[in-house]
């Protein structure tokens, strides 16, 4: 019996167990695993049809990455293809998603894409690799729901309800999908489920005007400072129960030595809070684990597992250092304090280095290199808007990785 035949004769229970181990690493590796032979395919669970309702199949390591050069999702030159980037391995895949021909992107979370149909404002949650879709209420119902709770609703239009600070997706034991969205311009949280909901619901409470947010394990986390001289607080918003979303729960307080601008970012299995040191004229950054803050351990970390954090004012993202060979691990990419230029802050040494693409002139974000596109990726999902927001930020990374990938 040759080696190939031995693999084909594995017991189905063992194949299934190996498959779950592979899936814990990456969904697309699991798809390739199932394609090895008919036995392996029949012994493992097919992700199609379960891509949304079974959270094990959520492609969390994959982020939607625009092509650059103003080729936004839905552009005719892309022929329906969208590029995704694996934040753990650095691999790219292109998926053909015909829905983008008449849909626009509202947000993306855990590798899933929240879409708005332009014709009737229907909202859909899409799994880009299995094609599974969950139908959610039209976005126009969110406008009416907010109008019922706010006397100021007459000053808003639909565009104000399309700006999200964060989105979370959770799945109940019965397979009901709940989507929570944090409305950045309205300071409220809205939610809807896939269980036949006909309209979005809006929280009866609101947040303070300034915050940083992140989605993690189906919950929303908020970092905010209520007053100028108060310590920043971290709040947790749980999925709604019985059609009502409870107020944010205070779960941790950051020490006063962390100063704005703040950032929250999911990094591996942790949520990290980033801020500036309060020492006079200091350019140092401080990073705290949420788990440590909950235990009132206020010692900043000196390593982030070799990852690179992209701390943007809109969204922050963690990428494995293995996926970015031109970058040094344990680095934070963000605008320098008291400066509008992007820099690389090396956490272990406490030093800043410029991240400038010396071949370019001016301060527009580059559309041709990977690091720049990762940093700005949440600005350029929408085919109906400009590819990049104007900013005084120079281009990034070294000459040998400047070209389109």
Could you say what each language-model-derived stretch is?
Residues 57-61, 88-89, 105-112, 168-177, ...:
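Short, solvent-exposed coil/turn segments at beta-strand boundaries
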Residues 245-337:
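Cytosolic regulatory protein-protein interaction regions
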Residues 1-35:
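N-terminal Skp1-binding subsegment of the F-box domain
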Residues 94-285:
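A sequence/structural signal of beta-propeller blade repeats
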């Amino acid at each position: 019996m040759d080696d190939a035949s031995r693999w084909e004769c594995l017991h189905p229970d063992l194949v299934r167990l190996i498959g779950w181990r592979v899936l814990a690493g990456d969904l697309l590796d699991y798809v390739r695993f199932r394609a090895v032979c008919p036995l392996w395919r029949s012994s493992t669970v097919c992700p199609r049809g379960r891509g949304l309702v079974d959270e094990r199949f959520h492609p969390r390591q994959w982020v939607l990455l625009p092509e650059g050069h103003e080729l936004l999702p839905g552009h005719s030159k892309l022929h329906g293809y969208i590029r995704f980037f694996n934040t753990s391995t650095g691999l790219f895949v292109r998926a053909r998603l015909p829905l983008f021909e008449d849909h626009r992107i509202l947000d993306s979370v855990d590798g899933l894409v929240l879409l708005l149909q332009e014709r009737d404002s229907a909202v859909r949650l899409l799994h880009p690799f299995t094609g599974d879709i969950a139908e959610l209420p039209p976005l126009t119902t969110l406008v009416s729901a907010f109008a019922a709770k706010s006397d100021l609703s007459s000053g808003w239009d639909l565009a104000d309800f399309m700006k999200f600070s964060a989105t979370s997706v959770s799945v109940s034991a019965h397979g009901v999908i709940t989507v929570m969205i944090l409305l950045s311009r309205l300071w409220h949280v809205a939610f809807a489920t896939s269980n036949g909901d006909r309209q979005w619901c809006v929280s009866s409470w609101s947040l303070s005007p300034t915050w940083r947010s992140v989605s993690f394990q189906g919950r929303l986390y908020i970092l905010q400072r209520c007053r100028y001289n108060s310590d920043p607080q971290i709040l947790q918003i749980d999925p709604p129960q019985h059609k009502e979303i409870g107020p944010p729960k205070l779960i941790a307080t950051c020490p006063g030595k962390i100063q704005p601008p703040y950032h929250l970012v999911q990094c591996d299995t942790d949520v990290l809070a980033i801020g500036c040191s309060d020492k006079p004229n200091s350019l140092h950054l401080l990073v705290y684990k949420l788990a440590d803050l909950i235990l009132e351990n206020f010692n900043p970390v000196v390593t982030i597992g070799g990852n690179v954090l992209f701390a943007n004012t809109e969204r922050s993202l963690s990428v494995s250092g293995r996926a970015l060979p031109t970058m040094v691990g344990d680095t934070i990419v963000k605008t320098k304090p008291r400066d509008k230029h992007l820099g690389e802050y090396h956490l272990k040494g406490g030093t800043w280095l410029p991240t400038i693409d010396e071949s370019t002139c001016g301060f527009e974000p580059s559309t041709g290199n990977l690091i720049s596109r990762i940093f700005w990726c949440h600005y350029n999902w929408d085919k109906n808007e400009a590819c990049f927001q104007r900013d005084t930020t120079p281009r990034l990374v070294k000459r040998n990785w400047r070209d389109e990938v």
